[in-house]
Amino acid sequence: MRNPQLNEHGELQHLLTLDGLPRQIITAILDTAAPFTEVAEREVKKLPLLRGKSVFNLFFENSTRTRTTFEIAAKRLSADVVNLNIATSSSNKGESLLDTVDNLSAMQADMFVVRHAASGAPFLIAQHLLATGRDHIRVVNAGDGRHAHPTQGLLDMYTIRHYKGDFTNLVVAIVGDVLHSRVARSQIAALTTLGVPEVRVIGPKTLLPTEVERMGVRVFHDMREGLKDVDVVMMLRLQNERMNGALLPTPQEYYKIWGLTAEKLALAKPDAIVMHPGPMNRGVEIDSAVADGTQAVILPQVTFGIAVRMAVMSMLGSH
């Protein structure tokens, strides 16, 4: 069966997940993003690649960083951008997701950027567009439930490649609440596809998926042991909003065991980089001295995110 993200020519049609996406597509996105990083340095930060196209940002969950970077990316490509305010929209008045999509499609939308609390919502939209003969409209998953956050995974890969070059000689550690993290799932899919020989996940048993070892990773419940000789440390926040009343340690208890401090970071390689998808909780999963330190590349991740999202939208808009 054909990958629903690719057209009959094997080109990117939607970006829904990094799981199962071919290595050459991921690499092509990273390669396409590289020249877009230079656009930010220009006096006029505009390219005409999506001129005349309409991009609708459909954010059914709160977001600042992701929504803003998608908006900036689309505008730098000269697209017309519509931000749907879900709090006051028809979805709060009982309209279904697909009815909302139908109505926006009737406004000649060319691309939907979708964030939704329900895993699979962007897939549902893409399937609906295909079934109703509107598969010229592209869908980008900006995060769905616990399932996936593909553009975050891609910008993380771009960041690693920028600082480390080759993926095939790295040890990468993902630390924290993997169980509730769509970012972690996208990171693991991309890292394994790109040939990283050792991906580690580090966290308490209660915050790791039961099937995590089947994802091709090494599991550590001792943070100090897991950080030994790693090249990249990817921190994750506690996803309190997805825990549904689970028993949690206090922030102080969590920080003591799982917070990244300078002392714990010293166990990694001397040139290891520290990443975080944001928002960051200082004094919980990461110490301020580390977040603001020379090994942190957290702000460059945000900058690279614009270029990566430009790459995704320009590739989708050209097919």
From Swiss-Prot:
Q: What are the alphabetically sorted keywords of the record?
A: Pyrimidine biosynthesis, Transferase
E.C. code: 2.1.3.2
The UniProt annotation places carbamoyl phosphate binding at R65, T66, R115, H149, Q152, G278, P279
A single Gene Ontology MF term assigned here is: aspartate carbamoyltransferase activity
Q: Which pathway does the UniProt entry assign to this protein?
A: Pyrimidine metabolism; UMP biosynthesis via de novo pathway; (S)-dihydroorotate from bicarbonate: step 2/3
One GO term under biological process is:
'de novo' UMP biosynthetic process
Point out the coiled-coil segments of this chain: none
Keyword Coiled coil assigned: no
Annotated L-aspartate binding lies at K93, R182, R237
What are the record's GO terms for cellular component? cytosol
Query: Which catalytic reaction applies to this protein?
Result: carbamoyl phosphate + L-aspartate = N-carbamoyl-L-aspartate + phosphate + H(+)
Give the similarity note.
Belongs to the aspartate/ornithine carbamoyltransferase superfamily. ATCase family.
The role this protein plays is: Catalyzes the condensation of carbamoyl phosphate and aspartate to form carbamoyl aspartate and inorganic phosphate, the committed step in the de novo pyrimidine nucleotide biosynthesis pathway.
Record text on subunit structure and interactions: Heterododecamer (2C3:3R2) of six catalytic PyrB chains organized as two trimers (C3), and six regulatory PyrI chains organized as three dimers (R2).
UniProt cross-references to HAMAP family, sorted A to Z? Asp_carb_tr
The identity of this protein, by name, is Aspartate carbamoyltransferase catalytic subunit
Please give the organism. Azoarcus sp. (strain BH72)
